[in-house]
């Protein structure tokens, strides 16, 4: 135990962090980070994620604006648990800011422990203080633990609930006077939110299905059931919950994924049903009452699509989760949509759609609402995504929050041979290969996923002439899988048609078996994707190792596959392993000349994807000495 100045002793304070350290210290510029956790369902003083306060460097952030924007992102079950000042020594001030923004978020002071931190710009050193309750003095943290396996702590005892609700609300407005339309709309939304606990409303609770046709546990809860659910707080012991109350764990199989990915997200599904024939305990005669309208009125249909996620413990009673998480979450989303719609009630109504994401570097899901009227490339939507990238501390040169990046809650999920477009091609085959053998080298690899295209795919016999086409298809698949493009990977004929359309080839080229090279590939990428390319010319295969440093920089900054063309052969380069001191290097080659079945083991063992040295241990040259080579380095588009 640690002694205080007055001689009393206090217990040591442990702070557990699930988020990466760089999310708190990088970039090293003056800023404020909000810390997120789940005080109700995770161990006390646990930080699961960090969000950046906007704009950067603001000494006095607009707390009301911050609270409103965080409300739209935050999944119910997570909460603000602290703040960190980067470039300031005032950890206590950060803690008080966190308390203030949290109060604006929920309308009450936090009863759970709060964290304050400060980061020294020069050293990156972080100092934390904690207050274990409102009004409790902040004390220095005595132990900080950065979890090695944060996903396990988050999901071993945690789970998601998802509720979708389509609403078509009738808004009646006097035909000759729309001055009161906003008040009527607000009243309509508030009335809708209040009805979520009505006796005639039922909640169908279903467990996730991992395969089509698989049975799953399900129950139905009624509004009356929810009104009688007692307030249940986290106490660290599941035994104190009523044993007769169905817990969330009942809806999941004994073995379930302990991670959350875009391709496969498991959640308890909640469907809201309205039982208009609900039996009343009091018998009554059917009656009709007539209310004459004072003036002519028009009907405006307000279409809303609600879609919320909630985080809870698997031991938490599902009825309590619906009552205390799902219904407040739906009410929150209604309120957010109300503010977005009200200014356009008399014009074209926004088409608001919520989506859920777990972008790279973030362990917990976030929700954002997009207006899909004009598509994703519309300027306002692009600016919204850019601000989200800044707040979530995501890079600004790649699309990570587009609709195609959203979590997929469909039955099943994907495996190594399935892509979002339904492709059955092998993906990311290099992940199974052994080390390169370069001593002390630094490995620089492709960033993202790709599909392996090789000879004889799609029923096309291109053996002997189609290797560059296959390399181009692999590169095109990378842009598609990283969400830069939604167009299909082109066939040989479609590639030839592009080259004819731009005037590079004569019409007789279409349907031929003529080779293409790096320059033709650059033309096609520019035409179909608007992608620019850098070309490196090498006079001989012997000189390729001299380009390893430049290639390493490419993979670190661009991360795209590289096409290598020399003589009549073409390869796809996925990375390099380079020792700058010794000059020793190896090239990670994906060979399109493979003609067999898509058998991963056969491909790896046969060397069709593997590390190649310019000269191997037996003195044989992989690259031809008497041929010049062109290296095509496609650039990553700067977009979100």
From Swiss-Prot:
GO terms for biological process: proteolysis. Its EC number is 3.4.22.-. InterPro entries: Papain-like_cys_pep_sf, UfSP1/2_DUB_cat, UfSP2-like_N. It holds the Pfam family UfSP2_N. The active site is at residues 467, 591, 593. Keywords: Hydrolase, Protease, Thiol protease, Ubl conjugation pathway. The keyword Hydrolase applies. Coiled coil: none annotated. Thiol protease which recognizes and hydrolyzes the peptide bond at the C-terminal Gly of ufm-1, a ubiquitin-like modifier protein bound to a number of target proteins. This is Probable Ufm1-specific protease. It comes from Oryza sativa subsp. japonica.
